[in-house]
């Protein structure tokens, strides 16, 4: 009798466990899925620019942006110029904003780059971002840069940049800097 009671209890326990899994699966299926238009959670802020993002930026645009960093590292200002639009808005890490023609921007950057004997960039990562409602493409980068000046001074910093790309060219560039030392 004890064996039968034990077996019945064990069977009921196993069935009860399986039933909960079924209930959990059906409860999960009844929950509405989050959509791009409706956030899954009640957030304390509403994005003023956009909260609708995808990674729908071409690999060619990504390569072009990363090549501009390689051109800076190698001192290839003419190569860097090819990745920039006719007019570029630049938000510098100093807080200054400049709007310059491609030629004037290259003059500014040539002066800076010519003061250095070497530049080394350790590209930590990047993200392709496409604002689906604004229809704008961005490549965001995170990297460390080590600059050796011709005076012998060595400077290093961590950077976070935002590159807005339109028609295969960078039209807006914002740079944020944190010195390493």
Regions found by a protein language model. Name each.
Residues 135-145:
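A short hydrophobic beta-strand element
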Residues 68, 79-81, 88, 105, ...:
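Hydrophobic pocket/interface hotspot
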Residues 77-129:
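A solvent-exposed, acidic/Ser-Thr-rich amphipathic alpha-helical stretch
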Residues 1-4:
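Positively charged n-region of N-terminal signal peptides that target proteins for export
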Residues 13-16:
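C-terminal motif of bacterial Sec signal peptides marking the signal peptidase cleavage site
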């Amino acid at each position: 009798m004890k064996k039968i009671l034990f077996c019945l209890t064990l069977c009921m326990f196993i069935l009860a466990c399986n039933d909960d899994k079924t209930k959990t699966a059906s409860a999960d299926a009844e929950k509405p899925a989050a959509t791009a238009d409706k956030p899954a959670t009640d957030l304390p802020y509403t994005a003023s620019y956009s909260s609708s993002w995808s990674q729908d930026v071409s690999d060619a645009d990504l390569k072009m942006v990363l090549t501009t960093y390689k051109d800076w590292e190698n001192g290839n200002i003419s190569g860097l110029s090819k990745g920039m639009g006719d007019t570029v808005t630049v938000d510098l890490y100093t807080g200054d904003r400049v709007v310059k023609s491609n030629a004037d921007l290259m003059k500014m950057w040539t002066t800076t780059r010519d003061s250095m004997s070497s530049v080394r960039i350790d590209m930590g990562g990047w993200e392709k971002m496409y604002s689906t409602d604004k229809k704008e493409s961005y490549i965001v980068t995170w990297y460390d840069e080590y600059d050796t000046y011709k005076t012998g001074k060595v400077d290093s910093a961590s950077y976070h940049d935002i590159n807005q790309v339109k028609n295969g060219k960078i039209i807006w560039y914002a740079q944020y800097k944190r010195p390493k030392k």
